[in-house]
């Protein structure tokens, strides 16, 4: 089985690696969902193209096993949803929540991500 990074890369999504990219996303838009928090920012014109996504879970989520399980679920949800609903030129950071990210049914996790992306990209009144 290929590593998770290459799974995201095959769908045209690259993974955020630098701390500065995560910090820039943290200062931009954010939208809470039942099982995760989604941060999003539109990149400047000179930056990389395409959709980029990062995943994080704090120690509040649990031990390393629980955090990695939550991130695997977020990674798979992003792989399924972002190619259709994500926008090129945007960075997304998916943050796992304690107990909800790992225990929520996967269909609910997908719905949470879709709803958060719709709200993030909705025109402001």
From Swiss-Prot:
Disulfide bonds: none annotated. Gene3D superfamilies: 3.30.230.10. Its EC number is 3.1.26.5. It catalyses: Endonucleolytic cleavage of RNA, removing 5'-extranucleotides from tRNA precursor. GO terms for biological process: tRNA 5'-leader removal. The keyword Nuclease applies. Keywords: Endonuclease, Hydrolase, Nuclease, RNA-binding, tRNA processing. One of its GO terms (molecular function) is ribonuclease P activity. It comes from the Bacteria. GO terms for cellular component: ribonuclease P complex. Pfam families: Ribonuclease_P. InterPro entries: Ribosomal_Su5_D2-typ_SF, Ribsml_uS5_D2-typ_fold_subgr, RNase_P, RNase_P_CS. RNaseP catalyzes the removal of the 5'-leader sequence from pre-tRNA to produce the mature 5'-terminus. It can also cleave other RNA substrates such as 4.5S RNA. The protein component plays an auxiliary but essential role in vivo by binding to the 5'-leader sequence and broadening the substrate specificity of the ribozyme. Consists of a catalytic RNA component (M1 or rnpB) and a protein subunit. Belongs to the RnpA family. HAMAP family: RNase_P. This is Ribonuclease P protein component. It comes from Ruegeria pomeroyi (strain ATCC 700808 / DSM 15171 / DSS-3). The lineage of its organism: Bacteria, Pseudomonadati, Pseudomonadota, Alphaproteobacteria, Rhodobacterales.
């Amino acid at each position: 089985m290929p590593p998770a990074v290459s799974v995201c890369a095959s769908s045209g999504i690259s993974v955020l690696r630098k701390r500065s990219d995560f910090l820039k996303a943290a200062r931009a838009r954010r939208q809470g969902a039942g099982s995760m928090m989604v941060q999003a920012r539109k990149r400047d014109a000179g930056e990389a193209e395409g959709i980029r996504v990062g995943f994080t879970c704090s120690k509040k989520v649990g031990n390393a096993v629980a955090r990695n399980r939550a991130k695997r679920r977020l990674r798979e949800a992003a792989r399924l949803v972002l190619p259709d609903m994500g926008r090129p030129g945007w960075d997304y950071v998916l943050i796992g929540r304690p107990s909800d990210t790992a225990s929520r049914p996967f269909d609910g996790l997908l719905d949470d991500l879709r709803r958060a992306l719709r709200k993030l990209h909705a025109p402001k009144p």
